[in-house]
A protein has these predicted regions:
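Expand to "…catalyze enediolate/carbanion chemistry for C-C bond making/breaking, isomerization
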Residues: 1-130
Length: 130
C-alpha cells in the first residue's frame, strides 16, 4: 500500500470516528468509550463541534421556553414542553463542563449564572414563580 492510500484510509477512519461521536451526542450519549489514544483528539474536536454548532439554536429554544414560563413552545419544527427543559439545561451544563461553552455564552438563554448553577430546571422554575 502506498503512502497516499494509507493517508486516504487514515482520513476515512478519522471522519468515521468523528461522525460516530457526533451521532452519539445528538442522541444523548455524552460518554464515550474510546479504545485507542488516537481517538481522543477526534472526540475532543467532535464534542466541541457539537456544542458550538448547537449553541445558537439551543440558546434560542431555552430562552423562548423560559420566556413563556415553561409552557409548551414550537420553534420551527421543534416542539418543546416541560419534559425537555432539563435536557436543554443539561446541554449547557455539559458544554460548560467540557469547556466548549463559556458561562457568558450560556447567559444568552435568559438564565442567570446562579440559575444555571442550580443544575435543576425545576428549581429555576420554582425560583421564578416565587
Amino acid at each position: 500500500m502506498c503512502s497516499s492510500d494509507l493517508k486516504r484510509v487514515v482520513h476515512h477512519a478519522w471522519r468515521l470516528n468523528f461522525n460516530n461521536v457526533i451521532h452519539s451526542l445528538k442522541h444523548g450519549y455524552y460518554q464515550g468509550w474510546d479504545l485507542h489514544p488516537s481517538q481522543l483528539p477526534l472526540r475532543y474536536a467532535a464534542v466541541y463541534s457539537f456544542f458550538l454548532d448547537g449553541l445558537a439554536s439551543t440558546s434560542l429554544r431555552l430562552k423562548s421556553f423560559m420566556g413563556k414560563a415553561a409552557q409548551a413552545t414550537l420553534i420551527g419544527d421543534v416542539f418543546d414542553d416541560a419534559a425537555t427543559g432539563q435536557a436543554l439545561l443539561n446541554y449547557f451544563l455539559q458544554g460548560i463542563s467540557c469547556g466548549a461553552i463559556l458561562e457568558k455564552d450560556a447567559e444568552k438563554t435568559g438564565l442567570t449564572l446562579d440559575e444555571i448553577r442550580t443544575r435543576s430546571f425545576k428549581k429555576i422554575l420554582q425560583g421564578r414563580q416565587s
